[in-house]
Amino acid sequence: MEINYWYKLTFEIEANLEEIIIWKLNELGISSYALEILLNNKNNKKVLIWLPNLNWPKSLRIKLERNIKEVLDKNNYRTNCFEWIVIEQEDWMSSWKKYWGPELVGKKLLVLPCWLELPEKFKNKKVIKIDPGAAFGTGSHPTTSLCLEELEKFSLSNKKILDIGSGSGILSIAARYFGASKVYSIDNDYLAINSTESNFRLNFGDLDDLKTYLGRFDELVSKYSLKNFDLILCNILAEVIKGIIPDIRNCLKINGEVIFSGILNSQKDEIIKLLNASNLQINDVSSKQGWVCITAQKII
C-alpha cells in the first residue's frame, strides 16, 4: 500500500533544545524532519515533522505531541502551539526540498540531493547522490557525519560491510564508494529499505553489491547467519546499541571493527563500559554537537 498523504507537524523550540529534540525524534523512529531558524527570533527554531498517514493514526499523533511536550516541560519550555496540517504526496515531495543543499562531509565526501547539479567547486569530491523519499538521512546530522568522517579513515578495498539501521542508505553507499566489495544493510522500516535500495541504484546503477534485510538486527543475525564482517556501521540509538553489543561482536571477524554512532555525550561512559565487558577494544572516540562516535575492534 502506498503513502497517499502526509501529516505535517510544526512547533517552536528554543535553539538550545535542538539536540534533545532531535534525540527524542530519533528515539521515536522519526527521520523526516527539519529545523528552521526564525528570522524574527534567532533564539528560537521552528521544528517541522512529516509523518506518512499509513504509519501515524490519530492515537499515535496524540502520543507524539504528548512526548514532545514532556521533553520541553523538563527543559522549562512550555508551548501549546502545535500545528497539524495534511499535505498531499506531491506537495510533500516538494515541501522539504528547500531545506536541502550540497553537504560536505569530512575531507572526501559530498552528499548531493539528486535534483541538484554538482557545483563545479566540488568536482574533486566523492559524490553521494541521495533522494530520501520517506526516509530522511543526510550527512548533515552529527551522528551521520561523525560516522562518515570515521569511515573515510578505513581502507575498505574488498571488505565485507554490515550497515545496521541503514535509513536512506548513505553509509552503505559511502562504504561501497570507499572500496567495499559487498554491503549488507539492515533496517526495521520497509520505507528505509526501499530508500536504501533506491539510493544505492541511483549511485551505482544496480544492486549487485548490496544485500538488504528487513527486520530487527538481533533476530536477523541467527536467521541468516550474519558473520565474518570486516566492518560494521551502527548509527542507531544508544538504548538499542546496549542490547545488541554481544551480537555485533559475534558478527565481526577477528580484528574486525565497528563504528558506533547515535550516542549522546551523557551515554558515552556506559557504552564504553559495555564494550569493554564484551572484549571489544576502543580504538577511537570522537564527538560533535553533543553526540559521540566510538570505534571498537574485536581482538580475540
UniProtKB/Swiss-Prot annotation:
EC number(s) reported in the record: 2.1.1.-
Protein name: Ribosomal protein L11 methyltransferase
Keywords, in A-Z order: Cytoplasm, Methyltransferase, S-adenosyl-L-methionine, Transferase
InterPro entries for the chain: Ribosomal_L11_MeTrfase_PrmA, Ribosomal_PrmA_MeTrfase, SAM-dependent_MTases_sf
Protein's GO biological process: methylation
GO CC, one annotated term: cytoplasm
Pfam families xrefs: PrmA
Subcellular location: Cytoplasm
Keyword Zinc found: no
Family classification: Belongs to the methyltransferase superfamily. PrmA family.
Keyword Chloroplast: no
Primary localization class, coarse: cytoplasm
Family matches, as CDD domains: AdoMet_MTases
UniProt: S-adenosyl-L-methionine binding residues: T144, G165, D187, N235
Database matches in PANTHER family: ELECTRON TRANSFER FLAVOPROTEIN BETA SUBUNIT LYSINE METHYLTRANSFERASE
Chain's role: Methylates ribosomal protein L11.
